[in-house]
């Protein structure tokens, strides 16, 4: 289990970027979304979306339906929000800011 400070840092990285939040919000409402869906539905510029998705995957906020050993095979990924992780990050942010 990561320590609370790491969780807080990850939470700040999630919420400091409105584009990250917009993408998470879209995918949460459309689980299993493809990149083309996310581009259209979140109004995220094509040039930014790959970077945003990688950042959210690194934070473990998103999951994809392709196991690591199958990635790079040309298959389109379907993205889903890891709601447990989002709650964990928001709880860490709440605890750090409000001490509760």
PLM feature spans:
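Short, cationic-aromatic polyanion-contact patches
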Residues: 11-19, 34, 67-91
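Pre-recognition alpha-helix immediately N-terminal to the DNA-recognition helix
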Residues: 21-25
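Short amphipathic alpha-helical interaction segments
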Residues: 44-58
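A short acidic, leucine-rich amphipathic alpha-helix
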Residues: 37-40
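A short, conserved structural fragment
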Residues: 60-67
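Amphipathic alpha-helical dimerization/coiled-coil segments
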Residues: 1-8, 29, 78-100
């Amino acid at each position: 289990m990561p320590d609370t400070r790491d969780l807080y840092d990850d939470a700040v990285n999630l919420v400091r970027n409105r584009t990250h939040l917009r993408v998470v919000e879209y995918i949460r409402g459309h689980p299993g979304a493809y990149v083309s869906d996310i581009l259209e539905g979140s109004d995220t510029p094509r040039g930014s979306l790959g970077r945003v998705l990688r950042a959210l995957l690194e934070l473990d906020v998103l999951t994809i339906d392709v196991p690591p050993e199958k990635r790079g095979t040309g298959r389109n990924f379907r993205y889903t929000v890891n709601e447990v992780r989002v709650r964990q990050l928001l709880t860490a942010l709440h605890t750090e800011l409000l001490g509760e």
